[in-house]
Amino acid sequence: MFEPLRKFPDFSDEQAAAWEAIAARMASHGVELEAGATTPRTEHSGPGEVIAVTGKAGSGKTVLLARLATRLAEIGLAAVTGDYEPRRRTRRSFAILAPTNKAAGVLRGHGVPATTIHRIVYTPVYDPEYQKVADWLEGERKTRPQVEGMTEAALDRAEAFYKQHGSVPGALAAAGVRGADFITGWTRRDQPLDIALVDEASMIDEARLDDLREIFGLIVLFGDPAQLAPINSQGEMVFETLPEPRRHHLARIHRQAAGNPILDLAHALGDPGLDFAAFEEMVRAAARDDDRVRIASRADAELMCTSPILVWRNKTRTRLIKAFRQAHHIADDRLVRGEPLICDGLELP
């Protein structure tokens, strides 16, 4: 029996109301957040149900999402991630999703096992030989597998890595198996899942939402109505088309209460009556009042070591990167400590 839910004293009234509304909808799908109980899945007929939590940056959407994810795991639901899925799934399931890998990475930074929508809509096809190793690591296979080309030492490395990190692709990489050998292709998912918590929902169009509704019985969208709508959405975000009872808005800005000039400026950009000159004056005023806002007439190579510089054109980006490397006497073909590296995530743990 799982522990009953302890209320969160740090929730605002809006967050608590949104939690209660989400908990009620999850209960109708057989997942009891309060009691910590689940009932067996029943096949849902028709598209999945959709509800939404909206609010600007700093309103507490991510905190609410993270608490929901933690609670779902506590009561025994299996988190479906972009890492690996066993072929036989008996537990109720949930997934934390984002439209892009960058957005999913932000959630992972909060300790949330997030992955991309694409990674859930499409599932990998595994090589049958390496599937034996995956099943063994996951406990689905009792006997140690024998796979051509894999030594006992390689299996030992895979087992040790999996026990420490819980990642099947990482374990296979530790054994010397490349992702391109382990995953031989991709196919559209035909196995239903239970609950999706979707962050950055302002970036999702109707077609992508329809994909999710074919897979999940319940979809909870988290989105910022102050963001720009997707290009092909005719100016409307998917959560804006939901009836009022299915939308729960968080109006209070928690981070603003701590005094955040960057957040103040970001929210000001949502004012349709604000022109460029007025916004520029707001930046100057913020710089006068707060050391966290500085106005510089040029790009500082020292600051670039720790602070990103945002530019409008790719040509400007390339020019600044070249100037930065020259200022630090870095050759064009040399990687240095701390420099970002973009790679195929399947090849590395």
Residue spans for each PLM region:
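N-terminal pre-P-loop "Q-motif" helix
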Residues: 8-40
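Hydrophobic positions on the alpha1 helix immediately C-terminal to the Walker A/P-loop
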Residues: 64, 68
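Conserved helicase motor core of P-loop NTPases
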Residues: 44-47, 79, 210, 214, ...
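Pre-Walker A (Motif I) flank of P-loop NTPase domains
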Residues: 37, 41-51
